[in-house]
UniProtKB/Swiss-Prot annotation:
Molecular function in Gene Ontology: 4 iron, 4 sulfur cluster binding; ATP binding; magnesium ion binding; sulfurtransferase activity; tRNA binding
Protein name: tRNA-cytidine(32) 2-sulfurtransferase
Motif residue range(s): PP-loop motif: 47-52
Biological process, per Gene Ontology: tRNA thio-modification
Organism whose genome encodes this protein: Salmonella paratyphi B (strain ATCC BAA-1250 / SPB7)
One Pfam family named in its UniProt record: ATP_bind_3
InterPro entries, A to Z: Rossmann-like_a/b/a_fold, TilS/TtcA_N, tRNA_Cyd_32_2_STrfase, tRNA_thiolation_TtcA_Ctu1
Gene transcribed to yield this protein: ttcA
Amino acid sequence: MQEIQKNTKKEQYNLNKLQKRLRRNVGEAIADFNMIEEGDRIMVCLSGGKDSYTMLEILRNLQQSAPINFSLVAVNLDQKQPGFPEHILPAYLEQLGVEYKIVEENTYGIVKEKIPEGKTTCSLCSRLRRGILYRTATELGATKIALGHHRDDILQTLFLNMFYGGKMKGMPPKLMSDDGKHIVIRPLAYCREKDIIRFAEAKAFPIIPCNLCGSQPNLQRQVIADMLRDWDKRYPGRIETMFSAMQNVVPSHLCDTNLFDFKGITHGSEVVDGGDLAFDREEIPLQPAGWQPEEDDTSVEALRLDVIEVK
């Protein structure tokens, strides 16, 4: 009995510590990008996955002690995939006492009609979903739309664009929506996926599977995800360093003429960003930039979230 109590206390301690880290990460992102302002009504897009559950939980937690007032409304889009457990999210949100809205739109039928069998449906599905969410935000009077993308998603997108798109473009933590009417925010921008996995497992969120549509997986993104996961295991701190690089861009040392006026450099021009250091031996710090090892940075390969079996 004492051993059980000891384990329970340790688990609670670890959960509290993890929640504080996620709360700190989200708080810093909100402050750095001015994501949430006084009086905001935040529409939290809830898919039923680990990321959106974590985002809602941390925002609710911050709401209690934030120096500003803001409200939350959770929104789920029921796209009418066969077998979608439509009772799960309403029951969960009612138990929490969170305001919510379930939007029912048969985008599944549209996608199946337009996309050949076996082809990736994500692009069309995403466009349809985006338009519905923008419309819903207007109907609810939401001032911000919160999405659950985390740090790993942002890095994956950067490498996807570099490897396959020929662009150095990531996923912005805050942006104006396509229709020019809504501000979209990503409060989990500084959060590590492995922390979210641990948190979701500890909180036992009722995870809904994301493979109900039967679409082919995004193989390119999976390749990038596997690469980053391998780097994280073999070279601790590399992921943090790469993310720091996204926040420390030097346009004069890249090749984009839209970002820097290379033609304007003439005799007598001032030295910019250290000038030409190409022939100097670069001093590389012994510890990766932006990395602080955590006590509980153990492998999460064995962690698996319990997914509700859909019958």
